Every structure is written in C-alpha cells, then in structure tokens.
A protein has these predicted regions:
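Juxtacatalytic substrate-recognition/specificity segment
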Residues: 15-119
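Surface-exposed patches in mature extracellular/periplasmic domains of secreted proteins
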Residues: 56-64, 115-119, 138-147, 205-212, ...
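Acidic/His/Gly-enriched intrinsically disordered linker/tail segments
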Residues: 116-189, 202
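Propeptide (latency) domains of metzincin metalloproteases
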Residues: 1-17
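Pan-zinc metallopeptidase signature
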Residues: 165-253
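Soluble non-cytosolic domains of exported or imported proteins
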Residues: 33-45, 91-96, 100, 117-121, ...
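Long, well-ordered core segments of solenoidal/helical folds
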Residues: 105-106, 110, 150-162, 212-222, ...
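Beta/coil-rich, acidic/histidine-enriched accessory regions frequently appended to metallopeptidases
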Residues: 219-363
C-alpha cells in the first residue's frame, strides 16, 4: 500500500514530450516554460554524481513536470522519481529551479529510520546540504551562487521567527506553519556541514561526512534499521566522543552555530545582524499572497494592510536577503486601484553567520 500511495500516473500523448539523459528521463504534457534540453542534461549529470558519491548504482529515474497556476514551484520525491509543479508563464530562475530539483534527487538515497522528528532533519537537511556541496565540488555551481544559497539558508535558520522551537515542536507544525517547516531542513544542513568540518579536522582530511553517509546507504539497503542512535554511534566510532550533544546543539534545540570552516577553509564567516522577517501576519501570507492573521498594531497593520486582502510581494528568499533598514514594498489592489504599501525592516534582529570567499587561499 505504501508503494501504491507513492505511485504517480501521467496520462496523455507523451511520445514527443520527453527526454532521456542516461538513466534519467524527463516527462511533461504542458510545455514547462524552461529549456528542457539543458535542464535534463544538467540534472542527468547531477544524478550520476550523486549515485557515485552515495555508493549506489544508477537505475532508471523519472522526472515528471506538470503545470500549475500558482507562484513558484513545488516538488515531491517518490520511488525512482519525483514530480515537480511549476507555472509555465512564471518559471523559477534557473538557479532556484536546479537547487530544488537537486534537493529532490538526494531523497532517492538518503534516509534514516524512526519517528518524523528523529529523521526529518537528516532526510531534508542532507538533501539541502548535498544539493549544494556536490555541484560546487564538481564545478557545476560557482562559489557566488553557492554562498548566496548558504547565506539565505543561514538567515532562514537563525533569524527565523520560529527559531526558538525545538525540533519536536517544529515537526508538529511541519505542514501548517511555513516558517517552522524550514527548521529541520536548515538545521540538518548546518549540522552536517559542521560535522564534515569536525571529521576533516580530527582525521587529517581522511574522513568526510560522505563516508558515513555511504555506510548508511549501504547498510540500510542490506536491511539494517538505522535511527538517530545508530547515526550517533557511527560518528562516535570515528571521533571517539559523544555526538548527541552536537546534535542537540545544532538540530534538536538549534541553540548552537556551525564552525567557521563548516564549508571548507576557502570560506570565512562573520556574524551579521539581520532582520527577523516577522511582519505581523500569518506566515502563510508569504506563500499565498492572501493576508491572514493580521496582528493588531503589528508592522503590516501599522503600514495599512487589511485582513483578507490579496497582495503581491517578493518571493520569500528575496525577502530573507533584505538587511536592516531596507523596505519591503507590497502591492495591493483596492477597488480597481493599485497601491504600494511599504514596511521598513526596523524591528527585531538576530545575529546570523554569513560566509564569503576567503582571500589569498590555496585550498
């Protein structure tokens, strides 16, 4: 029944609406509004790269693209496939699209066993982590794009209005609160980056987090159940010190911060005071563009927004990139007239790690 629930059917004339790139194939009915040839070629290369990194043989893998009328895109992974919905008239930029799709590819291999709050940080965090670091290592992603994605993730993590939630609390809100939903992803990503740095330091660069991940993939494919305690044991066998305090600090409570060399010595880190994006309305407004949960005397209320209004605002990653003193411009239509309401980012702030390329390094 689980396999049946994960099965996706696409019906229609697909004879001319697909491309194959090695074991990976891409299928669509409505033209998706992107260059499918270059998209499929890059995704096929990424599939081969991940298959090799995780020590798992390549096998047929299908990507289904479908149209929807909404902003942005969403995707879900299934056995040997994933489905992505996008708006052909408003497609994502190439970088955001590739990052989303590379994330979904990782789900084909990397899993832990256990309850949701014990494994989601690994499943989603490893997908965020490897969708960035593997293309960077392979030269498929330049340092500027890599750092832009990492620094947005850091802001989503450490300036998140829900940052005080434990991972168990965040998991309970996983499908109802957009901001809480992001915490397992980004905390897991920065934990794995920090762990990779600790492994490299303690083993004179001989062991990476990749080596532990390959062991998990191998042993789970042989039928072994590996949960959070099994993961910690594998780390401890290499580092010879308790791992749970690190996991608690960076994932369970989120109180800790990754080390400066989490992504390698070619980057340096600084702590930056950035805005906490809490505008005084329900977080779903950032996704739907429909104002809900307006807080009396909150920033949006003071700026003149009304509950249940439809608004147009930048995509959330663009909002997260904003700095203290910037102004968020929101377009709203009232009675056939269009107006712009501005919310200055002068509220709460948080110190967040941000990375940049280190000058004069040979690493």
């Amino acid at each position: 029944m689980e396999l049946l629930g994960d099965t996706y059917f696409m019906c229609g004339d697909l004879r001319e609406q697909h491309l194959r790139e090695g074991p990976l194939s891409t299928w669509w009915l409505t033209p998706p509004g992107i260059d499918v040839d270059s998209f499929s070629a890059r995704l096929g290369t990424t599939y081969d790269l991940m298959s090799h990194t995780f020590g798992a043989p390549a096998h047929p893998y299908r990507v289904f693209l479908r149209a929807h009328p909404h902003r942005g895109a969403n995707a879900s992974a299934h056995p040997a496939s994933f489905v992505m919905a996008m708006n052909p008239s408003r497609p994502l930029d190439v970088g955001s699209l590739y990052e989303t799709l590379a994330h979904e590819l990782v789900h084909e291999w990397l899993h832990l066993d256990g309850s949701d709050h014990e494994k989601t940080w690994f499943v989603e965090g490893s997908a965020d982590y490897y969708s960035l670091v593997l293309p960077l290592r392979a030269g498929m992603l330049d340092q500027a794009a890599f750092l832009a994605a990492v620094n947005v993730a850091a802001r989503e993590c450490y300036a998140n209005p829900r940052r005080g939630l434990s991972i168990q609390q965040a998991q309970r809100l996983f499908f109802s609160d957009f901001l809480a939903h992001r915490l397992p992803y980004v905390r897991g990503m920065f934990y794995l980056a920090d762990l990779d740095a600790r492994l490299r330091r303690e083993t004179a660069q001989k062991v990476r987090v990749d080596d532990l991940v390959r062991g998990v993939v191998r042993d789970r494919s042989a039928g072994e159940q590996i949960g959070i305690s099994g993961w910690c044991t594998r780390v401890e066998n290499t580092l010879h010190s308790p791992e749970m305090p690190h996991l608690d600090d960076l994932v369970i409570t989120g109180a800790g911060r990754p080390s400066e060399d989490a992504f390698g010595s070619q980057f340096e880190m600084e702590m930056v005071d950035v805005p906490v994006p809490d505008f005084g309305f329900d977080s779903s407004t950032l996704v739907t563009g429909h104002v809900r949960g307006l807080v009396p005397a909150g920033a949006a209320d003071r700026a003149g927004l009304h509950d249940r209004e439809d608004i147009e605002l930048p995509r959330y990653p663009e909002i997260v990139r904003m700095n203290v003193g910037d102004v968020l411009d929101i377009k709203v239509s009232r009675g056939g007239d269009s107006a712009t309401i501005s919310i200055p980012l002068t509220g709460a702030t948080a110190l967040v790690p941000q990375w940049r390329t280190r000058q004069h390094t040979t690493d």
